[in-house]
């Protein structure tokens, strides 16, 4: 029941996601229909010709050899060979045969057949042998007679001589080779008569090659040998002639030939995109950790697969139903693509193929954890599994049944074989029917359609088993691997016996063993929800082991929130991942609600709620759908779901976002939703990994309240980087450092252990005197310590024992506040932040902020002294201009940034190295780029050579028994006695051979026509020969009629007649058994045959196109991923020129393209393909390939703009390449076949398709090959030249000729299109289009803007904001050039269903050395402002100027003057931190000699040195932010934009970042910063504005805003109430009494937060009162500060409506 419910839920999820991905779904439907459409279109275009009357053929005389043989061969006469030469009888018969013919001929005996074969192979005169008669008897003596039962075989030349070019449209038709003795019928049957225009039956040439004449002559000679006189008498009154069966009225349909060859390929291409989509969808879920997240929520793996399978199956069912409809529906009078086949069987076949394709895609997906890589390799494998068909098709008749079945283990081959069978049944005229399911097409074959269906289903099962096994043993990055033999373990099938936690483990206090003073006693009265015992995790990094967690032992209790703290990389996320079963612990145990994590994960997951660090949301599900989905997944009933979801939406405050898709939510809302998912359906164990990162202050508070409410009966584990959050929420706080647990206890316990006393924090004014402050503090409190000096903050530690001196100190500070330049100050007891920093410092001195700051500055001082010999007044910590400023100062003096050509070259080099690094790091991709084309071509050439490695034909007995039981009609219209006699003998003879003689009383030919039209295709297998005995004057004419649909019926028919005559002469025991055993090929012929490959040029081109389709689309991957993560935007902002960016990429990609191209030449050389390797044609081929590269790469760049995910781009562009190359190439090639009669249309299409590089390449390669071979043939001999002229076979002397088959137009087209695509690319990217875009957008949006601005509330504007506006609106020219950033009435409207005014007329001027803070709630318009300022979004109205240049008109110049750190890290995973900084340093134009020093400084200043040489993808979130900030700061741009730079950083890193930013500011840079951390804004900003609904609501320095919008003090106190409410109430009463007018702002658990209004309150006084009250009211901890910025910020909260879209 549960299973069904989960299955239904997953199906609903998959269906909803599919429904929302409209384009993908449409493409999946459209592509199969497109390929079916191509067939329908061809069906309509290819005219079938109706032949209304029966076709009747004339008699064929076999008494004489054809005329061709009356001309002697070059250099001699024809030879008639016989074996064995020592037998007189053999010689006699052969001589008799020679005398029978009128031409000059000599007899040549060979002692054994081997001698004869050697003669044929190696003797140059062997081509003169007309035929050899080989008797299959052992003649011991020369005089031994010939027995009555004669057995012999005729050996004619392998290559036919009397062969005329027939106009089949393909010069070198494979079928012209050999005698087809391996098969009885053609591989592909034809619906009309075979070779309708040849009365002699055409191939393999029994009549025209003289085979029947020789056969009849030998048979007559045998009769004369045994009964000379009576034979002589018989043949005087009897003549034997042959005749072809008449053919009933039929429709001549060249389309059936096209379909037999192309149906498999088109079906395979139809499912390519579906296959790639499946692989991508499944792996993307794995890559985004969604699959593992669902597993953590209690979903079993097999259900996950079943749901995917059912969804894709249902979808495929729709697709194949449409395809069946298109194939079987009659498009014009009684003609469909498959006119005769049973639609239900066609549907069954396509469905079986779809099922096996789905299973195949599943199997491929298990080997990958990255969607890009999976789609790349998966697509290649999909094609790769089709290639064996190229080997199978030509060898089909030689293969045994088991070989055919084995090759069907690849589903694509099985499908191709099935499609081929459908084509054969269609051509046979019956179509495939259910009754034919177990019957082969004809007697030749032993393979039937039922076996194909069976194999497709078997493949699906096998692929499914591989999927199951691989997923269990290699679950990828996330998941617990099973041992390789897991399926043999009973525990796998029956489950583990439940491990009961041992009594000693239950009772034992885990922390006793190593209890130190830093671990607080455990609560006695609470149950432990999670017990962790000695848990360790070791990671393999390269060859080294890296300790992730070392021996962690910890209890987490129900009803409590346990907070886990640690700097980035301390092991918090690792611990959570082990507890949730994402990866297994290396050693140790953990029990969650009594279940062990490595054994009972299934049980544990039922009660687990998880909110991971990264959002694991489905982009296309709405908020409510997420909650529904996960609630039901955890087991909530459908009935209770709506209420629970409604409740949760209310709790989260997301009611208005109920129906928004998650991809449109802002970062903060996504976090809320993730927490909601963790909480929903009453999860008992919650694990929240940084749940509030990226939220604004209001949202964060809401989440705190939510967690406090929800914790009562749950065990909650939470990690965070916000110390106030830890302090407020944590009942117990555990701190990890370097993978080890350092301490654990309540926040109070930790503060007592680690606290050093009180902290006094001062915010400096620009003219501040830090020295003076320091002296003053030390005067009052001698043992005070300077704690940190970061940004605008100074903080001192005042020891507890000096409390009595504080009042006088504070009084003095208040008095001298102006004089010392103090903006504001506050004091607090030990904070959690301090505890955290102290713990870090004890474990690792590199975490000590002062220790870090000093050496960094010292180092810079030394560098400056040595490198630039500049003196500086560096006075340690107190000097404000250092750090990154170290480089800044020099640059003003010495360092001149590169400009002009030098800058362009430097940028080009930087971009080129970026591409090179990508290839180097993504070596698998490069390997695929090289191997795919080489493999494809090698396989194609192997298949072609394998085909052309023509086997010598086997012997074939010319007897009806080969065909099974057949009907032999005969008629005796004459009255002669001989005729009657013969007919009776015939009846007896046939019955003895188990054949069915049938006497026809009327006209025999009419009977045959009637039977053929009644029986249809089956007639050709049941009736192969017929005979008539009629009188012609004195003579009786015996006619051997043969059904020409079978290859060997002429000789078989004659053999029956000759046998009949022999029996008549010599009695029933007489018989002649004849076989056709063609001669082996001579070495000369073998060499010649190598070239006569039918579709070799076509095959080479086709495989090359398949390879190129995959190769070309890889060039889009980096382009898309750079754009998606905004790295490209940041590079442009850093000053890269468009041409530099794209041309460097093009150059590298052309070099990457050259490597496989050269290897392709090597392959052609290895296979010695003359067309491409002789006469200097290798250079031509290389030119073709490189021109293709030059055309296709820019096209891929252009098309990459349509995609936002690299994997999507890769799959869709591969499909585009297949369509634009293979599909167009096949269509044009089919239309060029003369029989199809569409040459004119093919020429038109060929010209239309010239814009597609893929088409040009395919046609050029194919034409080049064909032209070479035709030219070589036509100039090989006079006869050949005569033939070529006679049949108008054209070739070009100049390969580059314009007209077909020259390749001039393709070459020119590729050369031109490369240039055109590049020009288009530059137009899209450059200012020209940018300006046009700005103009058009602005034009369209201005009226919307005016309308919206009229609507916005007419609130009076704040005075400061108005002053700033007027300052900006009337600027002087000097001030414009001097002011780094001026924003003038900037507005932005987003066109949505309801147009959104995101930014509304903001004006601002940011001066040098100023750090301006943009504050606002999520959705206030901060990020949109940044996007406009950096040129990512167009401006609706207004403008902005950077260094005097306008953003609307001079975006290029503007970008050279700005640094930008976007909200989400715009980093390239494949580079190291150092490489990225070096790249951006080059982009900025820092001279090469200084780059290393500059990068070193930046790394040191941001504490990134230990990580400098690691790949960015291995960085933690905090380190990525540091690197992004470093990139913005490097090269000293005039204006720096930082969008939430410190998100996700731990406190140490955050302070270092502030330091760095402050130094940049002090060196004269203008900085604009947005942040959710008010602390950060106070530390860094000189001025700030609070944005609400796209407008500035207030503006000024932090102190100014605090004084204006909030006066008095802020008091936060934590009371030790121990759950007794009255204790807290007493304290609250005390505050109300002592500070009249005080307002209780906030109350959380035991924490109260008051606003103390006070004009008359002095800080010293407040402090004094609280010190005294501390003991009395049990105040654990309090802090008094001037009103904080956060409170000012929150006072604007009510003005901001609920947010709309991400970051706007």
Swiss-Prot record:
It is a multi-pass membrane protein. GO terms for cellular component: alveolar lamellar body; alveolar lamellar body membrane; cytoplasmic vesicle membrane; intracellular membrane-bounded organelle; lamellar body; lamellar body membrane; late endosome; lysosomal membrane. The keyword Nucleotide-binding applies. Its EC number is 7.6.2.1, 7.6.2.2. It comes from the Eukaryota. The record marks 174-175 as: Cleavage. Disulfide bonds: none annotated. Highly expressed in lung, moderately expressed in stomach, intestine, and kidney and weakly expressed in thyroid, brain, liver, spleen, heart, testis, and thymus. Catalyzes the ATP-dependent transport of phospholipids such as phosphatidylcholine and phosphoglycerol from the cytoplasm into the lumen side of lamellar bodies, in turn participates in the lamellar bodies biogenesis and homeostasis of pulmonary surfactant. Transports preferentially phosphatidylcholine containing short acyl chains. In addition plays a role as an efflux transporter of miltefosine across macrophage membranes and free cholesterol (FC) through intralumenal vesicles by removing FC from the cell as a component of surfactant and protects cells from free cholesterol toxicity. This is Phospholipid-transporting ATPase ABCA3.
